[in-house]
């Protein structure tokens, strides 16, 4: 006789992506999707209503942001296990999500079978890291890095600046005033010991966040 199914909640701001994951997950006999959310704010609200066993979520979303949403989800439903499914393939994003309380990290390039296995593994109390990410993390120092001192918003501004975006462009995308972005930039430079955007880009490349 089959055991109880794993109740899964999906969090992603793209409806088509959620639909694809729903079809994949519900094809597994031991799983069902009990809730969906398109933003961090929605996820925090929905998780209390559906009480999932596992939350499969992206971290790049509008609103409060993925890491803050992750923390609030675990505060509202501490019994839930969070599996991050992200487009980011670098160790730094994985490290930040695990530090925030995620039980696993998988990239969206992973095979369908890997997602199903990851859900089962974290549901059973284990952790799951994609092999490529695990190798990157193992190769990095276990001591705190300067990038770990950045807040979630500072980290987003840092990535944008290192990618070549201007303060005005970042202000528009993040719905912030240019002066607020300028304040973040000042704090980022102080924390990372960088003098200009070129040095920020170099730090990002060394961390695997940008390709040369």
Report the location of each language-model feature.
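Active-site residues of response regulator receiver
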Residues: 12, 58, 86
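Short hydrophobic/Thr-rich beta-strand motif most characteristic of the beta2 strand and flanking loop
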Residues: 30-38, 46, 194
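Acidic catalytic/metal-coordinating carboxylates
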Residues: 39-42, 62-68, 89
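Short amphipathic alpha-helix used as the core "switch/output" element in two-component signaling
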Residues: 45, 67-79
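Active-site beta3 strand of CheY-like receiver
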Residues: 50-56
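Short, conserved "switch-loop" micro-motifs in signal-transduction and mechanochemical regulators
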Residues: 88-89, 179
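Short, flexible helix-to-coil linker/hinge segments that flank and couple to helix-turn-helix
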Residues: 92-99, 103-156, 198, 209-211
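Recognition helix of helix-turn-helix DNA-binding domains
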Residues: 166-199
């Amino acid at each position: 006789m089959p055991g109880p199914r794993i109740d899964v909640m999906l969090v992603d701001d793209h409806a088509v992506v959620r639909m694809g994951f729903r079809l994949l997950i519900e094809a597994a006999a031991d799983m069902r999707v009990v809730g969906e959310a398109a933003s961090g704010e929605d996820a925090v609200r929905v998780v209390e209503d559906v009480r999932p066993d596992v939350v499969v979520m992206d971290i790049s979303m509008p609103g409060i942001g993925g890491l803050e949403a992750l923390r609030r989800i675990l505060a509202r439903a501490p019994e839930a296990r969070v599996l991050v499914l992200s487009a980011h393939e670098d160790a730094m994003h994985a490290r930040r999500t695990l530090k925030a309380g995620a039980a696993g990290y998988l990239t969206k390039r992973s095979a369908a079978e890997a997602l199903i296995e990851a859900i089962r593994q974290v549901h059973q109390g284990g952790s799951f890291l994609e092999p490529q990410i695990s190798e990157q993390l193992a190769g990095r120092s276990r001591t705190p890095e300067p990038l770990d001192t950045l807040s979630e918003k500072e980290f987003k501004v840092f990535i944008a600046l290192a990618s070549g975006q201007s303060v005005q462009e970042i202000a528009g995308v993040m719905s912030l005033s240019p002066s607020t972005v300028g304040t973040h930039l000042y704090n980022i430079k102080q924390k990372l010991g960088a003098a200009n955007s070129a040095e920020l880009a170099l730090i990002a490349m060394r961390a695997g966040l940008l390709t040369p």
